[in-house]
Amino acid sequence: MNREIVGRIAGVGSRWPALALLSILWAPVAAAQVVDATSTTMLRLKPEWQAGDTRNGVWGTELVGLSVRNIEVAGVDDLNIQLSAWGQLSSLKDSIYTGSTGDIDLLYIQGALFNHHLSLTLGRQLVSGGAARVLQLDGVNGTLMFSRAFGVSAYAGAPTTSRFTYPVGEFAFGGRAFWRPSYGSEVGVSFLEIISGSVLSRQDVGVDGRWAVLPNVSATASGIFSIQEERVADASVTLNWQVLKDLEIFGKGAHTSPDLFLPLTSIFSVFADTNRDSAGGGLFWQITRQAGLYLEYQRLWVDGGNGDEADARTTIKLTRKSTMGLEARFLFVPTNGVTDLRAWVSHSLNEKIRLSADVEGTVLKNPVNATGGSIVGTASATWAIGSGWNAMLSGSLGATPFFQTAATLTARIGYTFSNWQQKGAAK
């Protein structure tokens, strides 16, 4: 496991000693009304392609989750503790995939004070909304409600680096003020600043809102402006219209500056596209009780010129136990393009066992390794064993630009525990 991550979790040189926090707060757990726990173990055999060489490796992953709710402490409402963590072992060294490592994704305590006027969250958490986008943070987050309609939130702490993310800085703080004039409507103004050492890594302001214009018409919009760069980092607007009970149409537009999603201190921002704009719309139509259709088209404006993106999906319920689907996605920009087609089917043998299969083919405009596409088929079986246990076995076989033949095998077993039936339901 990464030593920096372990040090941060255990409090060795850390400003947020999460492990110490957990040990202090664990005492009230015995009085908790509801405890939910999950454990998932996965084994995966798959190939790895690196510098023209192919080798097979085995990855073992363990994911655990714990939710402790309704902890009874005088003066505190909705007190709960949440934990989500994972660990992984790999048979390959220097793998291009995630190797032998692990981390804590979430570990926080949360509660409400003063008749729910103040809510506090302390520990490793996800801060979302407004200029924060989605920020994983070791710190504190609070929301103060002045009335049912108006409130402010503020947070501060150390941003963390998790799977599939990059370091964004060493200290972050920000907040959001919001107004909820009616059910389904909310507008907000927000701010975020991230510091890396003594250098400014990000400084953004944001506005966002959703509005129920009519009972069947709603609109959402958001925008984030980089103060340092004096440019819009991200903006979007979407209009939804429920024309009929079974028909919804929508239109949307967006502007993205990918380089502003990276820290201002990152050298990779030089290589990122400057702008990406899109506009289009689509629909979802439940044609019959057995068939549904989703269509979407976007016109693209990118640095190199114009492009098009389209998505079509249909789901058909063949019988009470069988369902099939067809999907197609097309993306074309001036210098590249991809066409992706997928078909899948799912069938329930009984209440506990479900079988599924799919085949996916991709056609590339520009060949990779002298190969113009890929095709991969997958078959899987899931089994709800009972008493909280479940299992899955899945295998894939196909050819990709990186492998003449690619085969993967995945096995998973999971366990879920909850005392909600005994305590939560009775209460």
Each model region followed by its residue ranges:
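N-terminal secretory signal peptides that target proteins for export/translocation
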Residues: M1-S14
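Enrichment for repetitive, rod-forming helical segments
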Residues: A10, L22-S23, A131
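Gram-negative and organellar
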Residues: A32-K427
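Bacterial N-terminal signal peptides
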Residues: P17-P28
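Intrinsically disordered, low-complexity Ser/Thr/Pro-rich tracts
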Residues: V12-P17, S346
